[in-house]
Design a protein with these regions (language model features):
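N-terminal export signals
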Residues: 6-23
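Short, solvent-exposed loop/beta-turn-alpha elements that line the ligand-binding surface or hinge
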Residues: 52-53, 204-216, 282-291
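Secretory targeting signals
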Residues: 1-2
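Short, surface-exposed acidic
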Residues: 153-159, 266-277, 309-316
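Short, glycine-/small- and polar/acidic-enriched structural segments
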Residues: 24-163, 179-185, 196, 201
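Secondary-structure end/capping motifs
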Residues: 231-307
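Conserved C-terminal helix/tail region of periplasmic/extracytoplasmic solute-binding proteins
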Residues: 300-327
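Pocket-lining segment of extracytoplasmic ligand-binding domains
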Residues: 86-87, 168-171, 175-261
Length: 327
């Protein structure tokens, strides 16, 4: 079990940007997000979409792995964050006072094989060296789905090489020190674009095989709001979802602007962002009934395969009441 202090420890480098003073009658809100989160939160930031919904918003871009960002919410340094869904559930059961208020993007993960590693099937990974950021939701999700869909354990049946952040995995693959990596967009797309790796399996395909669900979108990134802030400002849940909806409209309706924003925040080459944009499974917003049903299945799988421990994940009514917040 990865305990809370293990995966949320670490420092934080914030690049805080006060939003423009537009229609700020609802008060202040601090929204932080991952630099490589790939959730359209960049668009909320650069277009100040929370400002359009009446908030005086301060946006912070957080580099690296998700742990330090989650720690910022737990310590109330920020009011809301984007976060991988599995880590959100883990933090909740470990006592972090948070609620899931909406979703941001469908699963982004993939297993990328080194081009000359001789891997053509997921089963070929047995006994091979695989790099992963072990504390991330992508690793745990893909491990659970591989267990359920293929019957073998990536953590036990391969040689896991632990990385601290996505760029480390890219370096390991480039040096041929590993045969494959378990990562997420846009890192996966950058590796493929450079010709160093090929897609062995995408997380969405692993999900469909493991669950037998041909429709619906499992979620990689969701929005979390600290309970204290949410209690005092319940309207933030609706407004954050509306801002995300606006961002998704820009993502699909104005792709050139979306790519420009993402490139500015991630600092990735334009051609990488363009490929990752095309490979994105689905940008999402809100918390509709059918999405909640899919999220509950995700939680059940993570409980079944040991990442989550609490009995709450076996009780859909409690999940809806205590973990989600629907405006």
């Amino acid at each position: 079990m990865i305990r809370r202090r293990t995966f949320i420890k670490g420092g934080l480098a914030l690049a805080a940007t006060p939003a423009m003073a537009r229609a700020q009658g609802k008060g202040k809100v601090k929204l932080a997000y991952l630099q490589l989160g790939w959730a359209a939160t960049e668009i909320i930031h650069k277009e100040d979409l929370l400002g359009r919904h009446g908030w005086q918003a301060e946006y912070s871009v957080v580099p690296g792995a998700p742990g330090p960002l989650l720690n910022q919410l737990a310590s109330r340094n920020v009011d809301a964050i984007d976060m991988s869904f599995a880590l959100a559930a883990k933090a909740f059961e470990d006592g972090v006072p948070l609620r899931v208020t909406g979703v941001a993007t469908a699963v982004l993960g993939a297993i990328i094989a080194r081009k000359d590693a001789g891997l053509s099937r997921v089963e070929d990974l047995k006994g091979r060296k695989v790099a992963a950021v072990v504390g991330t939701s992508t690793f745990f999700d893909i491990r659970a789905l591989t267990l359920k869909g293929y019957g073998f354990d990536l953590q036990k049946d391969t040689q896991i090489v632990t990385a601290t952040a996505p760029p480390d995995m890219v370096t390991l693959l480039g040096k041929k020190e590993v045969d494959a990596i378990i990562a997420w967009q846009p890192i996966t797309d950058a590796v493929v674009l450079r010709g160093e790796g090929v897609y062995l399996a995408k997380q969405i395909d692993l999900w469909r095989k493991a669950t037998g669900r041909p429709t619906g979108f499992p979620v990689h990134v969701c929005y979390l709001v600290h309970n204290e802030f949410l209690t005092k400002n319940p309207g933030i849940a609706r407004d954050l979802n509306d801002a995300q909806r606006d961002a998704v409209e820009i993502w699909y309706g104005k792709p050139e602007r979306a790519i420009e924003i993402v490139q500015d925040v991630t600092k990735l080459p334009k051609e990488v962002v363009q490929v990752a944009y095309k490979e994105t499974v689905k940008m999402l917003s809100g918390l509709p009934d059918e999405q909640v049903d899919t999220l509950i299945v995700q939680l059940k799988i993570n409980k079944e395969f040991g990442f989550l421990k609490s009995d709450i994940w076996e009780n859909p009514d409690r999940i809806r009441r205590e973990f989600f917040y629907r405006a």
